[in-house]
């Protein structure tokens, strides 16, 4: 998309603001994972700086697992800032499904959604996966035997819609206006 995706505007607020608002409405333990310290976007949340660079979103998961240990949490939910329509019942449904599993991952329209997954904060399993060269969130989810949770969708209303380009941002803006009426 070019530029800083978290700072792109949707419905009068940044994508990051939408994600932070969604998360803080569901938990009192929310942190913001960033690649480097200079990416300070929201000083009201704890900032987690990626320890592993150049490996993508799984680095944020490692930071989240560290945060979970520090705050004595068994699970973490990692979301991307580019999914502004996450379902309100995401945490409840994934929490009900995870059981003793390593993760509960939603699926929608036949696609797994690793950036909206509830993870058991198993730092050892993640360290082992990374040491063997693993870098895929989906791959790690399969490694820890993630339970999948199917999400029903309505036409044109994928709750895991992902904004990856300017056209998707325009589509999200149209959808945002429709849903906020």
Q: What residue spans do the PLM features occupy?
A:
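Nucleotide and nucleotide-moiety/phosphate-recognizing core
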Residues: 1-134, 139-159, 166-180
């Amino acid at each position: 998309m070019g530029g800083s995706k978290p700072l792109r505007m949707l419905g009068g607020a940044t994508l990051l603001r939408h994600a932070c608002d969604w998360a803080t409405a569901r938990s009192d333990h929310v942190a913001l994972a960033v690649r480097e310290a200079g990416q300070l976007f929201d000083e009201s949340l704890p900032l987690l700086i990626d320890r592993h660079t150049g490996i993508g979103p799984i680095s944020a998961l490692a930071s989240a697992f560290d945060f979970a240990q520090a705050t004595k949490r068994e699970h973490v939910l990692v979301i991307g800032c580019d999914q502004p329509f996450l379902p309100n019942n995401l945490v409840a449904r994934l929490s009900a499904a995870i059981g003793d599993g390593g993760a509960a991952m939603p699926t929608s329209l036949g696609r797994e959604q690793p950036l909206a997954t509830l993870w058991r904060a198993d730092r050892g399993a993640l360290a082992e996966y990374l040491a063997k060269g693993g870098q895929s969130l989906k791959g790690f989810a399969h490694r820890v035997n993630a339970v999948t949770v199917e999400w029903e969708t309505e036409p044109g209303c994928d709750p895991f819609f992902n904004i990856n380009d300017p056209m998707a941002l325009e589509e999200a803006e149209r959808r945002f206006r429709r849903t906020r009426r």
